[in-house]
Amino acid sequence: MKNILDFTLEELKEWMKENGENAFRAKQIFDWIYKKEVFNFEEMKNISKALIGKLSENFYIGIPEVIDYLSSSEDGTRKILLGLGDGNIIECVIMKYKYGNSICVSTQIGCRMGCKFCASTLEGMVRNLTAGEILSEVLIGQKLLGERISNIVLMGSGEPLDNYDNVMKFLEIVNADYGLNIGQRHITLSTCGLVPKIREMADKEMQVTLAISLHAVSDEKRKTIMPIANKYSISEILDACNYYIEKTGRRITFEYSLVSGVNDTKEDAKSLGRLLKGMLCHVNLIPVNEIKENEFKKSTKKDIETFLNTLKTYGVEATVRREMGSDINAACGQLRRSYIKSKGLKL
């Protein structure tokens, strides 16, 4: 049996025709799933019993089990722990803003990028999520919240461009009129810098915001915290980013996790300012999430403020990310790890 959430409208239309059904039935079924949040074929009232029988024999609607659902008492952030059909566990985070609801989704179970400050990569890669599994995070998030999700950030567990085909299919369905109809300009994809895939994505001329996890201003320093730096230099990443800007007209976001004594000095800020000066970009400064498995500590408020103000002297737009959901382990990978460990399960 196949997860119907892995299908585009054209693919489901083709299946309908191959199985003696009218192609327009595909749109009706997706209306039930994406517009009416009905996740059971039997409840689709304008679908014949015969077709429901065929659907039930060939497909399932892959909505995961909700294992845990936490709400922050500080800012209303929600953390959802989900169980997949194969026993694996993923997580997503819903953040409430004045402009609407945003969800941070995972794209892989674990991650093989090995970034030193990230909890989701500690035990390596388990497997990629399918397009439908990524979609299910948004669907279950909306269902639990009881409100529309208007923004998506691909910043949860996993490297999205390491799961390129499934992520591109997810973006197609989530953006489509028949899907969740979320505009590409309301979607941000974060990558540690897989240069060929950045260029491939640029050639699609999508309007998705590209966010680069930079975190250091020299290749030498970046190699100590991000193994991907051994493969792609900062210069190569910036060239790919400029190509993305040229093809899409979209501003790039650079994410920079501030780690005390590692990359947070005034000289680091000056180097970053010189590196990005004149580029169509924005820098998102992130106080690092402290985890037990490493000794990284957050920069002081004073050092963060100095870093921010120094960047601005170079004409580089920058802000400090507001920490959300800290009381519920909202950073990517943290809740999954703590849950699995508490149950004595294997990561």
UniProtKB/Swiss-Prot annotation:
The keyword Membrane does not apply. Its cofactor is [4Fe-4S] cluster. Its EC number is 2.1.1.192. The active site is at residues 91, 332. It catalyses: adenosine(2503) in 23S rRNA + 2 reduced [2Fe-2S]-[ferredoxin] + 2 S-adenosyl-L-methionine = 2-methyladenosine(2503) in 23S rRNA + 5'-deoxyadenosine + L-methionine + 2 oxidized [2Fe-2S]-[ferredoxin] + S-adenosyl-L-homocysteine; adenosine(37) in tRNA + 2 reduced [2Fe-2S]-[ferredoxin] + 2 S-adenosyl-L-methionine = 2-methyladenosine(37) in tRNA + 5'-deoxyadenosine + L-methionine + 2 oxidized [2Fe-2S]-[ferredoxin] + S-adenosyl-L-homocysteine. S-adenosyl-L-methionine binds at residues 158-159, 190, 213-215, 289. Binds 1 [4Fe-4S] cluster. The cluster is coordinated with 3 cysteines and an exchangeable S-adenosyl-L-methionine. One of its GO terms (molecular function) is tRNA (adenine(37)-C2)-methyltransferase activity. Disulfide bonds join 104-332. SUPFAM superfamilies: Radical SAM enzymes. Reaction proceeds by a ping-pong mechanism involving intermediate methylation of a conserved cysteine residue. Belongs to the radical SAM superfamily. RlmN family. This is Probable dual-specificity RNA methyltransferase RlmN. It comes from Clostridium perfringens (strain SM101 / Type A). The lineage of its organism: Bacteria, Bacillati, Bacillota, Clostridia, Eubacteriales.
